[in-house]
């Protein structure tokens, strides 16, 4: 279960840290609410275009790669759930990542007429000079396929994340402040179902007291060390994640 701290190590600023330069004087909620988008869609679209450019220049770091390698060796016994919208887990090789807050690399119709993941097959909305580009199906503006303030998490994605939390034996909570709900409730759900929690974060978090282990430091350093050998313990236990972090 990963958060913004993992992406920060790839040079991607958090939402509020990105409010610098030309964007420093804007109210964050003006740039990340449906009301703000409807009031000034061109402004919000340009903001997300700037963020997409920064993300495109970033690369997965050792934490992303170690998680993908663990998943590759362990198969369906590992589920990657993230609060990040940058797609770096997928670029590192993780498959079926549960993106709780959506993806900045996708767009969807503001009025909800199409499939968010495939809003317009064959249509390269990133190259459309119109700001924002229109939905080719109904003509309404396209919006970033991310969760804005005041919006619900994608119900199907969150339901799958809850099921994974309830079934897991071990949850690594990496690079998240564990303050943004409802996503932050997943470690508690896993703990109540009997899982062991290991927190990897530079700073204290509200769930440290629930954890079987807390590792202070950067994910890019600690996660490769933590996951080295974990797939072998998983295999030795016949498919159950090992009880030792």
Predicted regions and their residues:
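Conserved catalytic core of sirtuin-type NAD+-dependent deacylases
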Residues: 1-245
């Amino acid at each position: 279960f990963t958060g913004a701290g993992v992406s920060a190590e790839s040079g991607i600023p958090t939402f509020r840290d990105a409010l610098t330069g030309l964007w420093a004087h804007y109210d964050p909620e003006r740039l990340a609410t449906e009301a703000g988008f409807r009031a000034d869609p061109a402004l919000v679209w340009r903001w997300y275009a700037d963020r997409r450019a920064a993300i495109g220049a970033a690369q997965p770091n050792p934490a992303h790669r170690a998680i993908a390698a663990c998943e590759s060796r362990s198969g369906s016994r590992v589920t990657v759930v993230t609060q990040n919208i940058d797609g770096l887990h997928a670029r590192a090789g993780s498959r079926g990542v549960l993106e709780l807050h959506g993806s900045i690399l996708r767009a969807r119709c503001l009025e909800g007429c199409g499939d968010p993941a495939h809003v317009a097959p064959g249509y390269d909305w990133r190259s459309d000079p119109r700001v924002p580009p229109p939905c080719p199906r109904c003509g309404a503006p396209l919006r970033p396929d991310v969760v804005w303030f005041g919006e619900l998490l994608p119900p199907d994605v969150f339901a799958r994340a809850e099921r994974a939390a309830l079934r897991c034996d071990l949850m690594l909570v990496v690079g998240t402040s564990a303050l943004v709900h409802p996503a932050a409730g997943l470690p508690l759900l896993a703990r109540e179902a009997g899982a062991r929690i290991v927190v990897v974060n530079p700073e204290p978090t509200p769930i440290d007291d629930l954890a079987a282990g807390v590792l202070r430091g950067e994910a890019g350093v600690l996660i490769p060390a933590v996951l080295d050998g974990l797939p072998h313990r998983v295999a030795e236990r016949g498919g159950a994640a090992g009880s030792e972090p």
